[in-house]
Amino acid sequence: MAHKKAGGSSRNGRDSAGKRLGIKAYGGEHVIPGNIIARQRGTTWHPGLNVGMGTDHTLFAKVEGRVEFRAKANGRTFVSVLPIAQAAE
C-alpha cells in the first residue's frame, strides 16, 4: 500500500491590500478647503487650526492656505493650515 494520504491545503497564502494611509499633503504645501492632509487609523496626527477630522480620523483642510506640522511638549503632533494672508507674512 504505497499510497500518499491526501494533503490538506495550507492555512496561509492570503493578504489584504494596502490601505494607502499616511500624509497626503506635507508641511509647506498649498491646500484648498476639502483637501485631504492625512489618512490614518487613530490619531497619529491631531487636528489643529483650520483642520477638520472625519469619522475615520482623516484630517482635511477647512480653509485655503499652507500646511504646518507642529509637535507639542506632550508628544502630540498637530496639523494646522495657515491661511494665505498669514502664510505670506
Curated annotation (Swiss-Prot):
Classification via Gene3D superfamilies: 2.40.50.100
Keywords on record: Ribonucleoprotein, Ribosomal protein
Pfam families named in the record: Ribosomal_L27 (PF01016)
Domain of life: Bacteria
Biological-process GO terms, alphabetical: translation
GO cellular component, one term: cytosolic large ribosomal subunit
Keyword 4Fe-4S: no
The keyword Ribonucleoprotein appears for this protein: yes
Region (Disordered): 1-20
GO molecular function: structural constituent of ribosome
SUPFAM superfamilies referenced in this protein's UniProt entry, alphabetically: Ribosomal L27 protein-like
UniProt xrefs under NCBIfam families: L27
PANTHER family, sorted: LARGE RIBOSOMAL SUBUNIT PROTEIN BL27M, RIBOSOMAL PROTEIN L27
Similarity field: Belongs to the bacterial ribosomal protein bL27 family.
HAMAP family: Ribosomal_bL27 (MF_00539)
Name the record gives this protein: Large ribosomal subunit protein bL27
Source organism per UniProt: Rhodopseudomonas palustris (strain HaA2)
